[in-house]
Structures are given as C-alpha cells and as structure tokens.
Amino acid sequence: MNKWLALLFCSFSAIAAPKDTLSERLAMSEGFSATFNQQVLSPEGKVILTGNGKVDIARPSLFRWETETPDENLLVSDGTTLWHFDPFVEQVTLYRAEEALEQTPFVLLTRNKASDWDAYHVEEKGDVFTLTPTALDSNQGRFQITISEKGVVQGFKVIEQDGQQSEFTFSKVKQQKPNASVFNYKVPKGVEVDDQRN
C-alpha cells in the first residue's frame, strides 16, 4: 500500500513539475530588458518575415515592446492601460491592459500569476517549456518559452493552429527591473486617438 501511494505521489509530482519549474524560473527576476530578433515561418517552414526591436518587462504587468523593423510600432502597458502606437497611420489605440492580455500567453511573462497557469498544460524539455491551452474551444495555438535555470528569458515562440510560427530570440539581456519611467507613455501631438477602454 505504501509503495502504491509513493508511486501515485511521484506521478502527480512529475505532472506538476514543469509548470512549477517554469513559474519558479520566471519568479527569479522582477524584470529585464533586451533586444529581439523575430522570424515568422510558414507552416512549411519558409521564412516569410523577419524583424527586430527592443523589449522591457517589469512584473507585475508592465512592459514596453518596440518593433523597429520591418514596420515600426510600439506597445506600452503601465498595468492599467495598454497603448498601441502605429506611426504609419499616426494612431494610438488604448485598451484595458488586463482585458487585452488576459487571453494571450504573453501575460505569463509579464505577470506570472498563479491562476494564469490553470489555462495551460506545460511540458518541459531542457530550458524549453511548451504551453498548450487546456480549453477545448481555445483558438490559441501553442506557446514556447526558453528560460535558463537562472531565470534568464532567452526567447519565446508562438505556434498557431495552422502551423505558422512566430519566433522571438532575445539578446543583450539585462537582468534587472527597468525604471518605472520606461512604462509611462505620452500620446504624441497630432496623432489620432482611438480609446477602446469603454
């Protein structure tokens, strides 16, 4: 009987381990800054888009994501409001940050809240963690996070249901919480404002 209970406990521990390990690694840092390279691959593995930019993340729920190429755009969240600035159309769109991020795996990088993990099954292979939505009616694909044992996020990948992949690789990672001023956003003069928070 004791042997059976031990085996059962070990089985449950093994199932829970990847999710716990990923959460623990993310919790090692209050934030980071990095540059990123982006590759979008077709379901057949062909590169259809490349880009680069800069990212700043401070937990909980603060981030600045600036794409420099191929098209400039900026996402900034102060934890309450999410601003999306598109210089090409000279427009800033405002969203409620929590609502905008709630249904995306990206929220795990910025918030690492225990209840967020309930929506995903997590598999671990070395430093790569694959998250699959548990909801049968989810339209999300899979999400992979590469993070070292020291809590350094090296990149992530979004794998759509149709097989298309968007891969972001981080470099020049500065493992410390960015200054709060990085997440303060002022709408540029002369641009159109579309407030979607109502």
From Swiss-Prot:
Pfam family, one: LolA
One CC-aspect GO term: outer membrane-bounded periplasmic space
Alphabetic keyword roster: Chaperone, Periplasm, Protein transport, Signal, Transport
Signal peptide: 1-16
Entry-linked Gene3D superfamilies: Lipoprotein localisation LolA/LolB/LppX
Cellular localisation: Periplasm
Role description: Participates in the translocation of lipoproteins from the inner membrane to the outer membrane. Only forms a complex with a lipoprotein if the residue after the N-terminal Cys is not an aspartate (The Asp acts as a targeting signal to indicate that the lipoprotein should stay in the inner membrane).
Subunit structure: Monomer.
Family: Belongs to the LolA family.
Protein name, UniProt field: Outer-membrane lipoprotein carrier protein
